[in-house]
UniProtKB/Swiss-Prot annotation:
Location, primary (coarse class): nucleus
Protein's name according to its UniProt entry: Probable ATP-dependent RNA helicase DDX23
Assigned keywords, A-Z: ATP-binding, Chromosome, Helicase, Hydrolase, Isopeptide bond, mRNA processing, mRNA splicing, Nucleotide-binding, Nucleus, Phosphoprotein, Spliceosome, Ubl conjugation
Annotated function: Involved in pre-mRNA splicing and its phosphorylated form (by SRPK2) is required for spliceosomal B complex formation. Independently of its spliceosome formation function, required for the suppression of incorrect R-loops formed during transcription; R-loops are composed of a DNA:RNA hybrid and the associated non-template single-stranded DNA.
Pfam families for this protein: DDX23, DEAD, Helicase_C
Gene3D superfamilies tied to this protein: P-loop containing nucleotide triphosphate hydrolases (3.40.50.300)
Lineage: Eukaryota, Metazoa, Chordata, Craniata, Vertebrata
One biological process term in Gene Ontology: RNA splicing, via transesterification reactions
Composition-biased stretches (Basic and acidic residues): 1-42, 66-105, 112-137, 147-226, 233-244
Motif placement: Q motif: 391-419
Record's subunit section: The phosphorylated form (by SRPK2) is a component of the U4/U6-U5 tri-snRNP complex composed of the U4, U6 and U5 snRNAs and at least PRPF3, PRPF4, PRPF6, PRPF8, PRPF31, SNRNP200, TXNL4A, WDR57, SNRNP40, DDX23, CD2BP2, PPIH, SNU13, EFTUD2, SART1 and USP39. Identified in the spliceosome C complex. Interacts with ERBB4. Interacts with ERCC6.
Residues in cross-link Glycyl lysine isopeptide (Lys-Gly) (interchain with G-Cter in SUMO2): K686, K811
Organism: Homo sapiens (Human)
């Protein structure tokens, strides 16, 4: 009874054969059949073990009826075994699915199928070995003593020098080289593949979805027509297409191709834009006979078929004219004659008004004529209520005795600065004149001064001579002061006006004696004038006219404190009011003619307007009228500028080559240092050239002697420093050589301004070195602005000539380099 119960429980606990058969899926059955075919020995072993387990369980179940404890343990054991069996079945199912996948992959790639087959063969061999019991003995691990002995032997072998023959060394080097080449090729190939993958990926991402779908469909159709090709074949086709596209793009880029212009049509365009080009028009005749019509060449007044078209038109117009004349009444004829008369009168008046300003009288000039006049002479003014310029000396309001002196001095026509500055000066207004060197500035401030001094009674001038001069003219250099003195004496001596020059290099006692004798005009340099004022040789009690000539040069030379000190010695009582009254011409003219109670008039002439000059003008000038003449601060349009880049040692050889070209004297050569000036002049004299020097180290007599020799023609070449760069007027200078480039562009402009004066042309040659790179940019701009000069490519393309010194260049985003 107990045995039957145990059998029943065993049947309940263990699944029946039918259930196990039912639970087996067709896949499992198929896998088992395959395994059975591939390894029959494994299948036999599995059946034996299963029968053994079943037989053992039956015998144990019969002997277990004695004890419930043993039954319980048996059930648990059977349950564990069943669980293990189910787990094995599940693993087998998974292996079956995996094998199916491997089979599918092997159909696509033959390499994988081979791997799977070899693995399967290895498994079957292993099973056979297990079955026959031919197991290889396992390798035993080495002992510690063996390891140490082996390591010691290797170290001794490495320590011993090994001799290699030449052939072995060559073979080893060749092998290493081959390995390096292979490694490099492998890396390049990997890099190429990565780049290609990246490009393909980017192309696919940028590709239009519709275009991508179209391309995939086309590739699919090609694969269907060509058979099932592998991935490598498709990749090869794709690479060939990419290469053909790349070749087409290269041909289009370098061999030229017809670029299809994109047709755009705006919404507001009425004209329809067709898709074809004008060159595709098929209506054009290809036959040149019809394409180009024959034109009959006629001689003289010949006409085709005896018909003259012009004659026909004339006869037709005459016919209609006669017809209209017959139909008009007498009143209509008179009305037409009156209309024509009025039209002729209007045209005559228009022609009269449109005359050039030179053909008109002064009272006929209109505002438009004055504008044209200023444009003709490049006169630009700034400031309120500025008077009109003078057209000629006769049209000016100057006294007859002044005009007579002007005529005797040889001034036929006024220069542009004189045309505008003299009328402003006669109104007692402050003036800032910005004009190039050699423009006649001296007469522009002298003539209004002489006009005012001659209006004063001569007795008062003699009695009040101890109160100082009426006017002070300040110049930056002795040479310029002496030149102004010559011009002033030329104008003032016929009028009885005395002039004294207070400059360095001459005895101060002699100058003091001349000042005590009395004078109306003092021409001075700032340093010596302060010395004379502090030693009480001179007072400025009645000084009402101050002229600052070459004001920018004075500021550059450091005379700004001296100029301010001189202006502080002036009386304060005669200063102009800083109101609109200073711009009123009637009040200023009345004050100008009042005699002793005249307001102080300050005149400043400069070639450039740096900030320091503007600051000085704001401090001491009251509502000034600013006059700009031409391109002030720029080189003459008549001076041809030439530039040569060279080293310091090549300068002398180049200078001799230039002098041998036969330029007419006088010639001025500028250097930067006094010592270099003397050395260059001596070397030129040794080579047979007549040269003289002029610099700050020379005494006054030596300077005057050098200038007089050059003007008289006794010397041909003047070697000078920047002392001669400004204000010195030497007639007919044919060439200026900048042996040493000036330190700034303003000094360069004044240097080359010594030539090309009085309407004549000149040549300015400059030697440049690497040390002059600070002025390359401004020099390049000055040469480019000149119509008669050409900039050499060495200077135009030089890196320092591309931007102004001190400017911070910002790179464009496309020029930036990002270091990752």
């Amino acid at each position: 009874m107990a045995g039957e119960l145990a059998d029943k429980k065993d049947r309940d606990a263990s699944p029946s054969k039918e259930e196990r058969k039912r639970s087996r899926t067709p896949d499992r059955e198929r896998d088992r059949d395959r395994d059975r075919k591939s390894s029959p020995s494994k299948d036999r072993k599995r059946h034996r073990s299963r029968d053994r387990r079943r037989g053992g369980s039956r015998s144990r179940s019969r002997s277990r009826s004695k004890s419930a404890e043993r039954e319980r343990r048996h059930k648990e054991r059977e349950r564990d075994k069943e669980r293990d069996r189910n787990k094995k079945d599940r693993d087998r199912d998974k292996d079956g699915h995996r094998r199916d996948k491997d089979r599918k992959r092997s159909s696509l790639s033959p390499g994988r199928g081979k791997d799977f087959k070899s693995r399967k063969d290895r498994d079957s061999k292993k099973d056979e070995e297990d079955e026959h019991g031919d197991k290889k003995p396992k390798a035993q691990p080495l002992s510690l003593e063996e390891l140490l002995a082996k390591k010691k032997a290797e170290e001794e072998a490495e320590a011993k020098p090994k001799f290699l023959s030449k052939a072995e060394r060559e073979a080893e080097a060749l092998k290493r080289r081959q390995q390096e080449v292979e490694e490099r090729q492998r890396m390049l190939e990997e890099e190429r593949k990565k780049r290609k993958q990246f490009q393909d990926l980017g192309r696919k991402m940028l590709e239009d979805p519709q275009e991508r779908e179209r391309r995939e469909r086309r590739e699919r159709m090609e694969r269907e027509t060509n058979g099932n090709e592998d991935e490598e074949g498709r990749q090869k086709i794709r690479e060939e297409k990419d290469k053909s596209k790349e070749l087409h793009a290269i041909k289009e880029r370098y061999l030229g191709g017809i670029k299809k212009r994109r047709r755009t049509r705006h919404l507001n365009d009425r004209k329809f834009v067709f898709e074809w080009d004008a060159s595709e028009d098929t209506s054009i005749d290809y036959n040149p006979l019809y394409k180009e019509r024959h034109q009959v060449q006629l001689l003289g007044r010949g006409f085709i078929a005896g018909i003259d078209l012009k004659q026909q038109k004339r006869e037709q117009s005459r016919f209609y004219g006669d017809l209209m004349e017959k139909r008009r009444t007498l009143e209509e004829k008179e009305q037409e004659e009156a209309r024509l008369r009025k039209l002729r009168k209007k045209e005559a008046k228009q022609r009269w008004d449109d005359r050039h300003w030179s053909q008109k009288k002064l009272d006929e000039m209109t505002d438009r004529d004055w504008r044209i006049f200023r444009e003709d002479y490049s006169i630009t003014t700034k400031g309120g209520k500025i008077p009109n310029p003078i057209r000629s000396w006769k049209d000016s309001s100057l006294p007859p005795h002044i005009l007579e002196v002007i005529d005797k001095c040889g001034y036929k026509e006024p220069t542009p600065i004189q045309r505008q500055a003299i009328p402003i000066g006669l109104q007692n207004r402050d003036i800032i004149g910005v004009a190039e060197t050699g423009s006649g500035k001296t007469a522009a401030f002298l003539i209004p001064l002489l006009v005012w001094i001659t209006t004063l009674p001569k007795i008062d001038r003699i009695e009040e001579s101890d109160q100082g001069p009426y006017a002070i003219i300040l110049a930056p250099t002795r040479e310029l002061a002496q030149q102004i003195e010559e011009e002033t004496i030329k104008f003032g001596k016929p009028l009885g006006i005395r002039t004294v020059a207070v400059i360095g290099g001459i005895s101060r006692e002699d100058q003091g004696f001349r000042l005590r004798m009395g004078c109306e005009i003092v021409i001075a340099t700032p340093g010596r004038l302060i010395d004379v004022l502090e030693n009480r040789y001179l007072v400025l009690s009645r000084c009402t006219y101050v002229v600052l000539d070459e004001a920018d040069r004075m500021i550059d030379m450091g005379f700004e404190p001296d100029v301010q000190k001189i202006l502080e010695h002036m009386p304060v009582s005669n200063q102009k009011p800083d109101t609109d009254e200073a711009e009123d011409p009637e009040k200023m003219l009345a004050n100008f003619e009042s005699g002793k109670h005249k307001y102080r008039q300050t005149v400043m002439f400069t070639a450039t307007m740096p900030p320091a000059v503007e600051r000085l003008a704001r401090s001491y000038l009251r509502r000034p009228a600013v006059v700009y003449i031409g391109s002030a601060g720029k080189p003459h349009e008549r001076v041809e500028q030439k530039v040569f880049l060279m080293s310091e040692s090549e300068k002398r050889k180049k200078l001799l080559a230039i002098l041998e070209q036969g330029f007419d004297p006088p010639i001025i050569i500028f250097v930067n240092q006094k010592k270099g000036c003397d050395v260059l002049a001596k070397s030129l004299e040794k080579m047979g050239y007549n040269a003289c020097t002029l610099h700050g180290g020379k005494g006054q007599e030596q300077r005057e002697f050098a200038l007089s020799n050059l003007k008289a023609g006794a010397k041909d070449i003047l070697v000078a420093t920047d002392v001669a760069g400004r204000g010195i007027d030497i007639q007919d200078v044919s060439m200026v050589v900048n042996y040493d480039m000036a330190k700034n562009i303003e000094d360069y402009i004044h240097r080359i301004g010594r030539t090309g004066r009085a309407g004549k042309s000149g040549v300015a040659i400059t030697f440049l070195t690497k040390e002059d790179s600070a002025v390359f940019y401004e020099l390049k701009q000055a040469i480019l602005e000149s119509p008669v000069s050409s900039c050499p490519p060495e200077l135009a393309n030089h890196p320092d000539a591309q931007h102004k010194p001190g400017t911070i260049l910002t790179k464009k985003r496309r020029e930036e380099t990002i270091f990752a």
